[in-house]
Amino acid sequence: MAIITTNSDYFAHRYEVIIPFVVSTICSIVGIIGNGFITVIYGTEWVRSKRLPTGENLMLMLSFSRLLLQIWMMVEITYSLLFPIIYNHNAMYKLFKAISVFLNYCNLWFAAWLNVFYCLKIVNLAHPLFLLMKQKIIGLMPRLLSLSVLVSFSLSSFFSKDILNVYVNTSVPIPSSNSTKMKYIFMINVLSLAFLYYMGIFLPLFMFIMAATLLITSLKRHTLHMENSTTGSRDSSMEAHVGAIKSTSHSLILYIINALALFISMSNILGAYSVWNSLCNIIMTAYPAGQSVHLILRNPGLRRAWRRFQHHVHLYLKR
């Protein structure tokens, strides 16, 4: 069993608190506005019509989970930087990490199902299993989403056990002084942490990769068909393939970066209050913010709604 024990002094310089806190707060505000906007748009439509198409329902679930994730990370970073005594209490520390992992798992699952749904919608494949999934996916999606939340909760609950522990030593003497200082001692079971964490993200990441592979294969086949046809020009199907591939690749790359940052932050292998850990916190807050901006920019309906929102805000400020 590999254990990492980290002795961490609280901040030696004020800028080590201010700079990460300001940058993370800005990213969090952008993410809360972006994901909150998407949630309100689709949530209002759901309340008005009592139901949503499967794609829009997935967008609502994904944006709402990212909104919760963004708010929770903002709270966690605020406590870790400004209220370290409360945050580094062992039970509180485990609670923060377990909820962060749960929301990250849900976020990845919802994003994976969204990409799988659009893959099934766009790709034409004659395989019997693929055709069966294409027919059944709309009816099965509510159960799949519920199962994903249950799996995420079950796996994240293990992070409240003895994988992560933090202790406080208040009797560390200060040289040339009669006083003592406080040190936080983080004991991390890295093997258990890595196993549980990557077990939780393996299946949805595999779904991401499979969806991207099928889209690329289908696009290649469609391109060859168009080259052999009389026109040889891009059509709506090719545009849909290219757009879906770009979106899936964008989401996959950003999530892998975010997943690595979250693991490094949780394991404290670079120091609990180091510059690198602060960088990981910034990446984790920037990820859902960037994803919300990406969704708004690539979705025509959300772009129009955002322009209307900006117009109303502009008129309100001119009063």
From Swiss-Prot:
Q: Which GO terms describe its cellular component?
A: membrane
Residue intervals on the Cytoplasmic side: 39-66, 119-136, 211-251, 303-319
| InterPro entries for the chain | TAS2R
List the stretches on the Extracellular face of the membrane.
1-17, 88-97, 158-189, 273-281
Q: Where is this protein found? A: Membrane
Keyword Transmembrane in record: yes
**Alphabetically ordered keywords of this record:** G-protein coupled receptor, Glycoprotein, Membrane, Receptor, Sensory transduction, Taste, Transducer, Transmembrane, Transmembrane helix
| GO terms (BP aspect) | detection of chemical stimulus involved in sensory perception of bitter taste
Glycosylated residue positions: N169, N178
Q: Where do the TM regions start and end?
A: 18-38, 67-87, 98-118, 137-157, 190-210, 252-272, 282-302
Membrane topology, as annotated, equals: Multi-pass membrane protein
Task: Look up the signal peptide feature and give its range.
Answer: none
What molecular function terms (GO) are annotated for this protein?
bitter taste receptor activity; G protein-coupled receptor activity; taste receptor activity
Q: Which Pfam families match?
A: TAS2R
Tell me, in a sentence or two, what this protein's role is.
Gustducin-coupled receptor implicated in the perception of bitter compounds in the oral cavity and the gastrointestinal tract. Signals through PLCB2 and the calcium-regulated cation channel TRPM5.
Protein's UniProt name? Taste receptor type 2 member 40
From which organism does this entry originate?
A: Mus musculus
What gene name does this entry carry?
Answer: Tas2r40
